[in-house]
Amino acid sequence: MRRLPTREVVEMKMVVAVIRPEKLECVKKALEERGFVGMTVTEVKGRGEQKGIRLQFRGREVEVDLLQKTKVEVVVSDDAVDEVVEAIVSSARTGKFGDGRIFVIPVEKSVKIRTGEEEV
C-alpha cells in the first residue's frame, strides 16, 4: 500500500468586507502594508440598517434603497484573520451609518487553476 506524504493542514478563512467605495484605496493600502496583497474586489449594491437614503434630485425627492458598495474578499490562514479584520476596520471606518460589514467564512479547500494543486 502506497503512503501519501503528509501535509500540514492549515485552517483557512475568507474575510469578506462590504465597504464604502471611496474607502477601497485606504483598505488596499492598509492590507498591503501588513503583507496581504491578494484580494478580490467587486462593485456591489446593498443595504443594511440604514435601509437606503433619500436624495433631492432636480427638485424632487428620490429614494435610493440599494446603495453602491465595494466587496473585498481576502483568503488568509486562521491566525491572520484578526490582523486582516483590524486593518479593514481601521482604514474603512468613518463612524457613520453605511460603513459596512465584515464576515469571516471557513474555506474548505483551494485549487490553483493553472496547476490543479489543492490546498486543504
Curated annotation (Swiss-Prot):
Q: Which GO terms describe its biological process?
A: regulation of nitrogen utilization
Give the InterPro entries listed for this entry. Answer: N-reg_PII (IPR002187), N-reg_PII-like_a/b (IPR011322), N-reg_PII/ATP_PRibTrfase_C (IPR015867), N-reg_PII_CS (IPR017918)
The primary site where this protein sits is cytoplasm
Location(s), subcellular: Cytoplasm
GO cellular component terms, A-Z: cytosol
Do you know which Pfam families this protein is assigned to?
P-II
Family designation: Belongs to the P(II) protein family.
- The name under which this protein is listed is Nitrogen regulatory protein GlnK1
* Species assigned in the record: Archaeoglobus fulgidus (strain ATCC 49558 / DSM 4304 / JCM 9628 / NBRC 100126 / VC-16)
